[in-house]
Structure formats: C-alpha cells, structure tokens
C-alpha cells in the first residue's frame, strides 16, 4: 500500500525472541565469498535489484545508483517510516548497499557512470529496453569501457521480441506467463497469486544465477557477457508441466482453488477454532496415514479410496470427509494427530504466527538490524545457508546519497571542489 506519511506505531511484543546465534547466518567475521566484487545497481524496485541484494549478502560491494531528486521509487513504496526516504519495503529489500546519486540524463552524469563501470565487475539494470541506449549506455559502449563487465538486464518481456518495449511489472508478468490464469477457484475470477511481486523475485534469482555463471566464465576467459531475463519467462519457467501437457495432449490446466488435479486430499482445510491447515496426500501411503489419523483406516482400503485413481474419481467425497474431520477438531489437534502418523501437514501461518514459531526462531529466520533514523527493524535473514561462508545483512536500505562523496572522492579520485561543483549543478 502507498505510504501514509505517518510513522507506524511500534509494538514491542512483535519483536521475535533472540535465536541461537549458531543458527543465524553471518554472525561471525568470516571472509565472504564475493568479497572484492563490485556491483553497480542502477535499477528501480525489485526486478534485478534483488539480485544485487543477494550478491551483497555474500560480500559483494553494491553501489546503488539513484537520481539525485527522489531516488529509487521503491523508497516510497510500502509502509511509511520515520524516515521520509525509506519505507519498510525499501529498508528490507535494498539491504547491503551504498547509495550514490548520479543524474544519468546529463552528459556529465553519464561520464561519471562510465568511470564507475570501468572499476566494477557487474552492472544490473531493469529499465525498459532502449532506455540505457538513449542515455548513451548501450552494451557495446559499456563493453568497450570494461571488457570484463557482466551486465544483467531484467525487463518485463526481455530485450528482444515484439513486446520488448512494453512496460513490465510483476503483476503483468504473472498474467502473461500463465500464473494468474491458474490462481483462484474453478469458473471464478482469477486472483493475484499472493500479494508479493513473485515475478520480480524469481527473475532476480535467475539473474543472480546467471551472474555467478558469468563470473565463472570470466575467471576462465577474462571476458564479461550480457545476461537477458524477461520477468514473464522467469515465472513461466517454474510452471512445471503445463507446456508439455498442452504440446502433447492439448490439455489446458484450469484453476483448481486450493487443491490439485493430481492428488486428493491436497488443499486447505478449516478447523473447529476457525484456523486453517494444509494437508497434502500425494501418494497412497500418505492417504493411508491420514486415514489412520482420522481413526478410519477402512477409508484406505482397496475397495474404497486406497488407490489414487479411485480418490481422484471420488474427489468431492474424499474432500468432504477431510473437511468434516478437520472441522471437528481444533487446529492444534489436527496438527498433533497428523504429525503422529507422519501425514504432511502445516498451519497456514500469518506473520504473527511466524514471529512466535519455534522453528522460525531456531533457524534464525529473522534478523534484527539497526536502521539509521528509525531503530531496530526485523527483516528476513539470509538464505541460502552456507556452512563455511554464510552471508550476512550489514545494513538496511541506505539514506539517499549516503555514499556519493565517499565513492566519488575515494574510488574515482575526484576532488572535493569538483564534487561540490557537480552537486551545485545537480549532476549528483
């Protein structure tokens, strides 16, 4: 939701208890694997910049290039805080960065940017295709400036194809990729597949993988390369068998609600106390265990529903049996009985549930990080968990331009007088 301009009220009880430090990523002083790698993040919002966040968590130096007036729009997206230039979304997702303000629409700004490119390893951008070229920052120009440069370009539809110039956001990518078509109940309006911009995160994950592969190639050859990711195609890639099912059999998968066309019971069920559980029975053995948890082992007999094909043929009946059983018990009772019989089961957690869940806490899934001008903020911790080189969160989303002077003075060796002149002309 858009920022309100008001500082949200604090709730002391919302802070998760401290976890075992040995289970928390990055609590030591170990050398991080990407130390010495410099990343320029010149994108906005999440699609692409999130890849920079991942690299930063494992030691890369990330320079966030922003327009001097206002910076990344992500700063104003989400829940407002005491800092005018930082929502909670910005603090959480723009972690492990230094902010450098440069106006790329001015020629002197482009010249400064190219000096940074010459001293960097990776460049990440997510503008509409053609924008960088309009600024005089085409791939040939960048490659000539730094032949070892690795450039990740994330856009809604990729750098080629008839739709390349269209605006791209996660919501549109979910629709175009087929994900939104699958979300919702049969015959009803398709719904958002969750409220998070999944496509932006998924595209960034593929982008981060591409960068690591390109770094390996650079080690072997000394050459950089261009990485092109369309948000829609990143989402399409994770939709399992919908492409081969249509290609071979002309089958179009439709919306299935909380269930699955290949298994039953396999969905969300409401307990007597109004809470929800997820139950997944994808094999005959799992259903046999569920029948035992229900204290109705006869349901898993060959004559009734012991065979997957019979359960699928009687989907409504099997689901109704499960609905009635879960509805007769509290969620804790359902969980206990299923876990005793090793039935795959889990609660549908709200964030409040997660803050108090012993497993989240034992795994160190929360990091409490001090944010300048705000105080301590709880954010998701680093994954993946590496045994020898765990990542860490060093800082949350930085104030606008907090490292401009440092980077220009120390990295580019620009005089204090020249920096003052550039600032007066609003180039930085």
Swiss-Prot record:
An annotated GO BP: carbon fixation by 3-hydroxypropionate cycle
Provide the residue span(s) of the region labelled Disordered.
1-31
Enzyme category, top tier: transferase
Q: Which Gene3D superfamilies match?
A: Crotonobetainyl-coa:carnitine coa-transferase, domain 1, formyl-coa transferase, domain 3
What induces or represses its expression, per the UniProt entry?
Under autotrophic growth conditions.
Q: What is its EC number?
A: 2.8.3.22
One GO MF term, please? succinate-citramalate CoA-transferase activity
Which SUPFAM superfamilies did the record assign?
Answer: CoA-transferase family III (CaiB/BaiF)
Q: Which reaction does it catalyse?
A: succinyl-CoA + (S)-malate = (S)-malyl-CoA + succinate; (3S)-citramalate + succinyl-CoA = (3S)-citramalyl-CoA + succinate
What is the active site of this protein?
200
Q: Which UniProt keywords apply?
A: Carbon dioxide fixation, Transferase
One Pfam family this sequence matches: CoA_transf_3
Disulfide partners: none
pH dependence of activity:
Optimum pH is 6.5.
Indicate the temperature dependence noted in the record.
Optimum temperature is 55 degrees Celsius.
The record describes the protein's role as: Involved in the 3-hydroxypropionate cycle used for autotrophic carbon dioxide fixation. Catalyzes the transfer of CoA moiety from succinyl-CoA to L-malate to yield L-malyl-CoA. It is highly specific for succinyl-CoA as the CoA donor, however it can accept L-citramalate instead of L-malate as the CoA acceptor.
Complexes and interactors? Forms a large complex composed of six heterodimers (alpha, beta).
What family classification does the UniProt entry report for this protein? Answer: Belongs to the CoA-transferase III family.
Q: What is this protein called?
A: Succinyl-CoA--L-malate CoA-transferase alpha subunit
Q: Which organism is it from?
A: Chloroflexus aurantiacus
